[in-house]
Amino acid sequence: IKYFIQKALGKKMFRKPRISVCVPSGVTEVEKKAVEDATYQAGAREVAIIEEPIAAAIGAGIDISRPCGNMIVDIGGGTADIAVISLGGSVVSTSIKIAGDDFDEAIVRYMRKKHNLLIGERTAEDIKIRIGSCFPQAQAETMDVRGRNLVTGLPKTVTVSSEETEEALREPTLQ
């Protein structure tokens, strides 16, 4: 945390900063307190602990103070947080351990199995972001993907469709 404070403020740190830290929904009060203490020790003047779904709702431009429910699904790298937000807080929320990293790994496995193509996590993430889908799309999208042919060891390019990403992501989404 201290590294990021120094990185953001550089040498211009005249006053200790106010810092907001996001935590997954469902963390215990002890875990929140540990994050808060670590942030103070890193040099914060004030610390606000915000649950990730609430931060995601605010970031999406949702007025969280209104008396109507908004369902938020915040898929991070290691966890996915699902919450119903209303009147400035979470009505109900949960955090699951299936998230973006699992989707990337599923795409890597799919490319290896179906195309005999070795790709890295970065390429898998690019596929996920550009054409990834867990549901059938009205119009399929495609993209060219470069990797290493597992049979010849040479570079190889294949065209991958959103239907294939749907197939690749089926296993982690059903968990």
Model feature map: region roles:
Residues I1-I75, A83-Q175:
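Nucleotide/phosphate-binding catalytic cleft detector across ATP-hydrolyzing
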Residues G78:
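Conserved Rossmann-like nucleotide-cofactor binding loop
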